[in-house]
């Protein structure tokens, strides 16, 4: 692989060519209106038609059909709601549970204002944000794991 020489922009011949537009890609067809008005809608409508066609002709069953007369013992939410579900399940007062749920995004919104004087992007030079992140991740993991266990074992995660 050879070394490419950078163009000398002080060369009058090169400057004259650049002034005429010779240094740019001047062949081919323009993107407007050809691509944007004719090719893009064909691709977008073709993608939508393929998706709708597959959904109509080959519907996939999502699990087994629901039985309205057989209710499971404990209804669990989706996995990403496990920490919030665990908060609501373990706190006896409903108002306190809702306040704890509201405190999570409120606490996350206050983190940038705690370290607004620190302009570093390195997490090791931002101790408050790093500590909040690590503690929040550990608490969310413990709450999420606890939500999958029965209520008797959920607070101790079955370890004690």
From Swiss-Prot:
<dbReference type="GO" id="GO:0009767">
    <property type="term" value="P:photosynthetic electron transport chain"/>
</dbReference>
<dbReference type="GO" id="GO:0045156">
    <property type="term" value="F:electron transporter, transferring electrons within the cyclic electron transport pathway of photosynthesis activity"/>
</dbReference>
<feature type="transmembrane region" description="Helical">
    <location>
        <begin position="95"/>
        <end position="115"/>
    </location>
</feature>
<dbReference type="InterPro" id="IPR005870">
    <property type="entry name" value="Cyt_b6/f_cplx_suIV"/>
</dbReference>
<keyword id="KW-0472">Membrane</keyword>
<keyword id="KW-0249">Electron transport</keyword>
<protein>
    <recommendedName>
        <fullName>Cytochrome b6-f complex subunit 4</fullName>
    </recommendedName>
</protein>
<dbReference type="InterPro" id="IPR048260">
    <property type="entry name" value="Cytochrome_b_C_euk/bac"/>
</dbReference>
<dbReference type="InterPro" id="IPR036150">
    <property type="entry name" value="Cyt_b/b6_C_sf"/>
</dbReference>
<keyword id="KW-0602">Photosynthesis</keyword>
<comment type="similarity">
    <text>Belongs to the cytochrome b family. PetD subfamily.</text>
</comment>
<dbReference type="GO" id="GO:0009535">
    <property type="term" value="C:chloroplast thylakoid membrane"/>
</dbReference>
<keyword id="KW-0812">Transmembrane</keyword>
<comment type="function">
    <text>Component of the cytochrome b6-f complex, which mediates electron transfer between photosystem II (PSII) and photosystem I (PSI), cyclic electron flow around PSI, and state transitions.</text>
</comment>
<dbReference type="InterPro" id="IPR005798">
    <property type="entry name" value="Cyt_b/b6_C"/>
</dbReference>
<keyword id="KW-0793">Thylakoid</keyword>
<dbReference type="Pfam" id="PF00032">
    <property type="entry name" value="Cytochrom_B_C"/>
</dbReference>
<keyword id="KW-0934">Plastid</keyword>
<keyword id="KW-0813">Transport</keyword>
<feature type="transmembrane region" description="Helical">
    <location>
        <begin position="131"/>
        <end position="151"/>
    </location>
</feature>
<feature type="transmembrane region" description="Helical">
    <location>
        <begin position="36"/>
        <end position="56"/>
    </location>
</feature>
<dbReference type="GO" id="GO:0016491">
    <property type="term" value="F:oxidoreductase activity"/>
</dbReference>
<comment type="subunit">
    <text>The 4 large subunits of the cytochrome b6-f complex are cytochrome b6, subunit IV (17 kDa polypeptide, petD), cytochrome f and the Rieske protein, while the 4 small subunits are petG, petL, petM and petN. The complex functions as a dimer.</text>
</comment>
<keyword id="KW-0150">Chloroplast</keyword>
<dbReference type="GO" id="GO:0045158">
    <property type="term" value="F:electron transporter, transferring electrons within cytochrome b6/f complex of photosystem II activity"/>
</dbReference>
<keyword id="KW-1133">Transmembrane helix</keyword>
């Amino acid at each position: 692989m050879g070394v490419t020489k950078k163009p000398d922009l002080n060369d009058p011949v090169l400057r004259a060519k650049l002034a005429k537009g010779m240094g740019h890609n001047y062949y081919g067809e323009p993107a407007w209106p050809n691509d944007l008005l004719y090719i893009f809608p064909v691709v977008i409508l073709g993608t939508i038609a393929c998706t709708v066609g597959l959904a109509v002709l080959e519907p996939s069953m999502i699990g087994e059909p629901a039985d309205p007369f057989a209710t499971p013992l404990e209804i669990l939410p989706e996995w990403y709601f496990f920490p919030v579900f665990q908060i609501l399940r373990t706190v006896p007062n409903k108002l306190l549970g809702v306040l704890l749920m509201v405190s999570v995004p409120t606490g996350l919104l206050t983190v940038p204002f705690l370290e607004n004087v620190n302009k570093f992007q390195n997490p090791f030079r931002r101790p408050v944000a790093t500590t909040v992140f690590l503690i929040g991740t550990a608490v969310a993991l413990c709450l999420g794991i606890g939500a999958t266990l029965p209520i008797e074992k959920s607070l101790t995660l079955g370890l004690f």
